[in-house]
UniProtKB/Swiss-Prot annotation:
Regulation: Inhibited competitively by AMP and IMP and non-competitively by fructose 1,6-bisphosphate.
Subcellular locations according to the entry: Cytoplasm; Mitochondrion
Name of the protein in its database record: Adenylosuccinate synthetase isozyme 2 A
Catalytic activities: IMP + L-aspartate + GTP = N(6)-(1,2-dicarboxyethyl)-AMP + GDP + phosphate + 2 H(+)
Residues that hold IMP according to the record: 41-44, 66-69, 163, 177, 256, 271, 335
Oligomeric form and interacting partners: Homodimer.
Gene3D superfamilies, sorted: Adenylosuccinate Synthetase, subunit A, domain 1, Adenylosuccinate Synthetase, subunit A, domain 2, Adenylosuccinate Synthetase, subunit A, domain 3
Recorded family membership: Belongs to the adenylosuccinate synthetase family.
Gene that produces this protein: adss2-a
Pathway: Purine metabolism; AMP biosynthesis via de novo pathway; AMP from IMP: step 1/2
Length: 457
């Protein structure tokens, strides 16, 4: 085919550039990614909210309604679990990718709850787009999650501390190839019903105490199918068009965080999906060259919900102070978060996996009252420094953390709006983190509102 006839199969005039290797590479829009760099609850929602104001599409690529994001707009506090928090931007499309698992009652409940709070969600059904390849969480997945946790407690004396939202069981169904997807729900409902009954029976045989009202469930699912049908699209084609069409700002909102990743987190005390950068490609169906900036969100100290190793944890007055001042309670579970010092070993590890282009440092104001601040800089095992982050939980529980002590600033920073206005020692704390990690800090959070995010560049 001659050049003047153009290249076939390039939608919306996508440009084909010959590369050195002679292959054709598509030049198009790129996605901006926001990821948690610790154990979650870093304030990703706030960074997303900031970027979502200029976004055309805001995506979720993994997890389910086990995530919890809080966004404050015009003094109204919205809580998001499954919906991309960017849905409050009236001009953006909120896209739920194939890597996300969807509990339909939870989805509609969440939307309706937020609708009552303010104007942010008006017209949300017209702005939501769901990948037809996304798996569905059924009520029996959630019930099985609770039973599994109970069994772990009885058999091993400890559970995983899951949110009981059915996330583990539905990803298990997906891997076992017995799961059902949005495309099944919105096409032939009688075929869907047969497969649903089969899956329900399998769960009943695995968990005899499970009570499943099959007909009642199917009746509800049929109602949801009618409501959700206009939102369901071929996600791969939809994003391909968006990436290779006219200029667009596409934002990806990561749920959970690096240390909760199924592969790279503190296994087994992790979630059931990849919440590191690889999950963006597999959870949306986009190639790696479509990934642009990757922003890591880091709390100025460290928190963790539930059990699992936590090297810099402070079971003392400092930990209690961070917990109280930081209002450290989980958005999804209401559980108290464990608190400790910032851990640079953990952050270097998160950076190795994600390749952060810049960081957002949140909740710096919580440290305002401290006269000195410690930062974990290295780990030792049996007196020897180790260069890596241990995979084995028993080993991680045994590490001895070496700390660097930095001077505090004993000054209220809540009303600071530029980097220059920060107390000298607060600036030093920020620059120290940048230097140690080799990643620039782009934002600093000193409060709950949109305005309290200081942008450095």
């Amino acid at each position: 085919m001659s050049a003047e006839n153009g290249s076939p199969g390039l939608p919306n005039g996508g440009v084909c550039c010959a590369t050195d290797s002679g292959r054709c590479s598509l030049v198009g829009n790129k996605v901006t990614v926001v990821l948690g760099a610790q154990w979650g609850d870093e304030g990703k929602g706030k960074v997303v909210d900031l970027l979502a104001q200029d976004a055309d599409i805001v995506c979720r690529c993994q997890g389910g309604n086990n995530a919890g994001h809080t966004v404050v707009v015009d003094s109204v506090e919205y809580d998001f679990h499954l919906l991309p928090s960017g849905i409050i931007n009236q001009n953006a499309i909120a896209f739920i990718g194939n890597g996300v698992v969807i509990h339909l009652p939870g989805l509609f409940e969440e939307a309706e709850k937020n609708l009552k709070k303010g104007q942010g969600l008006v017209g949300w059904e017209k702005r939501l787009c769901i990948s037809d390849r996304a798996h569905i969480v059924f009520d029996f997945h959630q019930a099985a999650d609770g039973i599994q946790e109970q069994q772990r407690q009885e058999q091993a004396g400890k559970n995983l501390g899951t949110t009981k939202k059915g996330i583990g069981p539905v990803y298990s169904s997906k891997a076992a190839r017995s799961g059902l997807r949005m495309c099944d729900l919105v096409s032939d409902f009688s075929e869907f019903s047969q497969r649903f009954k089969l899956l329900a029976k399998q769960y009943k045989s695995m968990y005899p105490s499970l009570e499943i009202d099959i007909d009642g469930e199917l009746k509800k699912l049929q109602d949801y199918a009618d409501r959700v049908k206009p939102m369901v699209k071929d996600g791969v084609y939809y994003l391909y068009e968006a990436l290779h069409g006219p200029p667009k700002n596409i934002l990806v909102e990561g749920a959970n965080a690096a240390l909760l990743d199924i592969d790279f987190g503190t296994y087994p005390f992790v979630t059931s999906s990849n919440c590191t950068v690889g999950g963006v490609c597999t959870g949306l169906g986009i190639p790696p060259q479509s990934v642009g900036d990757v922003y890591g969100v880091v709390k100025a100290y460290t928190t963790r919900v539930g059990i699992g190793a936590f090297p810099t944890e402070q079971n003392n007055d400092t930990g209690e102070m961070l917990q109280t001042r930081g209002h450290e309670y989980g958005v999804t579970t209401g559980r108290k978060r464990r608190c400790g010092w910032l851990d640079l070993v953990l952050l270097r590890y998160a950076h190795m996996i994600n390749g952060f282009t810049a960081l957002a440092l949140t909740k710096l104001d919580i440290l305002d009252v401290l006269s000195e601040i410690k930062v974990g800089v290295s780990y030792k095992i049996d007196g020897k420094k180790i260069p890596h982050f241990p995979a084995n939980q028993e080993v991680l529980n045994r590490v001895e953390v070496e700390y660097e002590t930095l001077p505090g600033w004993n000054t209220d920073t809540c009303n600071v709006r530029t980097f220059e206005e920060l107390p000298e020692n607060a600036k030093k704390y920020v620059r120290y983190i940048e230097l140690e990690l080799g990643i620039p800090i782009k934002w600093i959070g000193v409060g709950k509102s949109r305005e309290s995010m200081i942008q450095l560049f």
